[in-house]
UniProtKB/Swiss-Prot annotation:
Biological processes per GO annotation: 'de novo' pyrimidine nucleobase biosynthetic process; 'de novo' UMP biosynthetic process
Enzyme Commission number, as recorded: 1.3.5.2
Active site: S179 (nucleophile)
Database matches in PROSITE patterns: DHODEHASE_1 (PS00911), DHODEHASE_2 (PS00912)
Cofactor: FMN
Taxonomic placement: Bacteria, Pseudomonadati, Verrucomicrobiota, Verrucomicrobiia, Verrucomicrobiales
Name this polypeptide is given: Dihydroorotate dehydrogenase (quinone)
Annotated keywords: Cell membrane, Flavoprotein, FMN, Membrane, Oxidoreductase, Pyrimidine biosynthesis
Species for this entry: Akkermansia muciniphila (strain ATCC BAA-835 / DSM 22959 / JCM 33894 / BCRC 81048 / CCUG 64013 / CIP 107961 / Muc)
């Protein structure tokens, strides 16, 4: 899709309530995919294949969790040119999320604040949607979380329930324990709770692999609001417990860079351009601690190809888009793939 065409579409979508615009966009993508015109509209994305943890990615640019919460637009996003698609966050039981309004654009700052709260129809419905995506043949990640009503001491059971349900359909499973929009969730990022949770997940991963004959890597998604000491502690946990992969980062509670926008006082996680630098710093800090033993997916404020390259140079193996995709459209996928291919070629 040309930048001019997306700009015209965005001018219409940005007249709508953000959550309505999101739903309309997903509906339009599904319709175009069903009519088999999506590849023509989106244009071709260059090939830049890479293999990580046994998964073969056609390129290194993925869709971050939160865009396709219900996993009902998987095939369309695959045809849009993404090298991989991560759906969710999905929870054991359906839940409505937080009260509306809960999604806000900060247009001058190219940012979004959301306090969605894991609104979804539940893991069973999500898995059924994935099974229906028969025209999707790419790498699929399933992002899972706990229900709001589940106390933290029982959180592991929620994650285990989702792990078991997602196992047959996922290429990798991402543990969301860093969203700022579920009360107390980030407490699980402390070293001891994180170690207990990861140990439970790795034990069940071994059981499921033995039962099914297939290995599904487990990733954990971390917040950007962490100190260097916390990064070092979590890195030791991840290495000791055998984490397969890391996703850095989730949205931030910081409002640095958006103070002038009247929306900056809205509660929730901030994403987009104001997060670019901090997320890259966190990727670099984790990469320094992990020393290449755990691959990193870099996400947070990728608004152009330069940002994507910076994430790779900081230590990420793959990147994901969300807010940049909202503001730039599908052309951003191609730009990032081309930039990384030129500046950070894969050693084959």
């Amino acid at each position: 899709m040309s930048p001019a065409l997306y700009s015209a579409a965005k001018s219409v979508l940005f007249q709508m309530n953000p959550e309505t615009a999101h739903k309309v966009t997903l509906w339009g993508l599904r319709l175009a995919e069903k009519m088999r015109v999506l590849p023509l509209v989106m244009g071709e994305v260059p090939s830049d294949p890479v293999e990580i943890l046994g998964m073969k990615f056609p390129n290194r640019v993925g869709l971050a969790a939160g865009m396709d919460k219900e996993a009902d637009t998987v095939s369309a996003f695959g045809q849009a040119g993404f090298g991989f698609v991560e759906v969710g966050t999905l929870t054991p039981r359906p839940q409505p999320g937080n009260e509306k309004p809960r999604l806000f654009r900060l247009i001058p700052q190219k940012a979004i604040i959301n306090r969605m709260g894991f609104n979804n129809e539940g893991i069973a419905a999500g898995v059924e949607n994935i099974r229906s995506a028969t025209r999707f043949h790419g790498v699929l990640g399933v992002n899972i979380g706990k229900n709001k009503i589940t106390p933290n001491e029982d959180a592991a059971q929620d994650y285990l329930t989702c792990l078991r349900a997602a196992w047959p359909v996922a290429d990798y499973i991402a543990i969301n324990f860093s969203s700022p929009n579920t009360p107390g969730l980030r407490d699980l990022q402390a070293a001891e709770p994180a170690a207990r949770l990861l140990a439970s997940l790795k034990s069940e991963q071994s059981n499921l692999a033995a039962e099914t004959g297939r290995h599904v890597p487990i990733f954990m998604k971390v917040a950007p609001d962490v100190t260097d000491e916390h990064i070092a502690e979590l890195s030791r946990v991840f290495l000791d417990e055998g984490l397969d992969g890391l996703i850095a980062t989730n949205t931030t509670l910081s409002r640095v860079g958006v103070e002038a926008n009247p929306r900056h006082e809205e509660a929730g996680g901030l994403s987009g351009a104001p997060l670019t630098e901090r997320s890259t710093e966190v990727i670099g800090a984790f990469a320094s601690e992990l020393k290449g033993r755990i691959p990193i997916i870099g996400v947070g404020g990728i608004m152009n190809g330069v940002d994507a390259v910076a994430k790779i140079k900081a230590g990420a193996s793959l990147v994901q888009l969300y807010t940049g995709f909202v503001y730039r459209g599908p052309d951003l996928i191609r730009e990032c793939v081309e930039a990384m291919k030129a500046e950070c070629p894969v050693h084959r």
